[in-house]
Amino acid sequence: MREPLVSRALKISLYIIFAVGVCGTITLPWMIDSYMRILYDAYYIQEGYRRFIIAFLMLSASLVLVIVWEMIRILRSVPIDPFVMRNVKILRQIGLLLILLAVMFFLKCLYYVTFLTMACGCMFVVCGLFAFTLCNLFRQAVVFKEENDLTI
């Protein structure tokens, strides 16, 4: 069966996002240095902020890259058999990673508060809860599929 256009477009987009994300994560320290040189005169930047923000963004980017890769793994299984326990586990892992990202962003607000940080934290919570909902939906679909396979 031929893969739907939307599925192919999403898979290609995720591969591009993953590649750009890897490049961005690798070059992050240099990008932060350039950013801080430009904005140093405009804002007072606390001592140690550079190390903190690089560590925070590297960890966040790494978690997002894992999430994107797991989404690619799910999309690979769609043409073959989407309703398998492996996809349930992947969706649960994605949900946990999104909640972890939300916690990280809210903890960052204790050190350096920005509206965007709070908005991202809220978005990660909602997306994490949605991933858990999809996980439960897929789990039920797997059970129904296995019951159906046994009756045939």
Task: Give each language-model segment a name.
Residues T27-A61:
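Membrane-helix boundary elements
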Residues A19-D33, G128:
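Alpha-helical transmembrane segments of multi-pass membrane proteins
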Residues P82-R92, D149-I152:
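Membrane-cytosol interface motif
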Residues R2-A19:
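Alpha-helical transmembrane segments and their helix-start/interface "positive-inside/aromatic belt" motifs
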Residues L65-M85:
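Membrane-helix interface/capping segments
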Residues A55-L65, G121, V125:
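Hydrophobic alpha-helical transmembrane segments of multi-pass membrane proteins
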Residues K89-L116:
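Hydrophobic alpha-helical transmembrane segments of integral membrane proteins
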Residues F106-I152:
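Alpha-helical transmembrane segments of multi-pass integral membrane proteins
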